[in-house]
């Protein structure tokens, strides 16, 4: 059953109200170019579901659960702000990217909607002060960035990513 725009907007409104309830965690992180910075992530605790309406989906992933017309829809909570965006860009599947590289973060300012190739490429990014070339700039250096890393990052081949 397809959702109406009103139903989608209701889900987004509910998500925006809920995301403010997540604890704000401060991280001191590498920004590239030898610089450090501070990021403020809204994190869901890993020990137990956070509040009514959340269900655990793996050790570090949670989904928001909402009933619409007596049908329970499970929304990937990172993708909720992007429900009105296209499912693909130039024929490539899209996903929510964490600009902060923190998979538990739900801060809307730390998320962007892009192709899975671009998302995976962020892992090799030198960071905002190290020469990030992404259309939406990373907030910190990628966790796999280091000697020999390329800014281009991997490309998807089947279900695997290769550099």
From Swiss-Prot:
GO terms for molecular function: endonuclease activity. One of its GO terms (biological process) is intron homing. Pfam families: zf-His_Me_endon. Signal peptide: none annotated. Gene3D superfamilies: Homing Intron 3 (I-ppo) Encoded Endonuclease, Chain A. Its cofactor is Zn(2+). Keywords: Endonuclease, Hydrolase, Intron homing, Nuclease, Zinc. The keyword Ligase does not apply. Its EC number is 3.1.-.-. InterPro entries: Endonuclease_Zinc-binding_loop (IPR008704), His-Me_finger_sf (IPR044925), Homing_endonuclease_His-Me (IPR044930). The keyword Zinc applies. Mediates the homing of a group I intron in the ribosomal DNA. Makes a four-base staggered cut in its ribosomal DNA target sequence. Homodimer. This is Intron-encoded endonuclease I-PpoI. It comes from Physarum polycephalum (Slime mold).
């Amino acid at each position: 059953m397809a959702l109406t725009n009103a139903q989608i907007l209701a889900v987004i409104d509910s998500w925006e109200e809920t995301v403010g309830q997540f604890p704000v965690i401060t991280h001191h992180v590498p920004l590239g170019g030898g610089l450090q910075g501070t990021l403020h992530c809204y994190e869901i605790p890993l020990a137990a579901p956070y509040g009514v309406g959340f269900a655990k989906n793996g050790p570090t992933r949670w989904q928001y659960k909402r009933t619409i017309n007596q049908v329970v829809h499970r929304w990937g909570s990172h993708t909720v702000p992007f429900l009105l965006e296209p499912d693909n860009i130039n024929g490539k599947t899209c996903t929510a990217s964490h600009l902060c590289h923190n998979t538990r973060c739900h801060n809307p300012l730390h998320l962007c909607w892009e192709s899975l190739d671009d998302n995976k490429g962020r892992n090799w990014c030198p960071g905002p002060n190290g020469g990030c070339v992404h259309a939406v700039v990373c907030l910190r250096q990628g966790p796999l960035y280091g000697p020999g890393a390329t800014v281009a990052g991997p490309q998807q081949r089947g279900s695997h990513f290769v550099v």
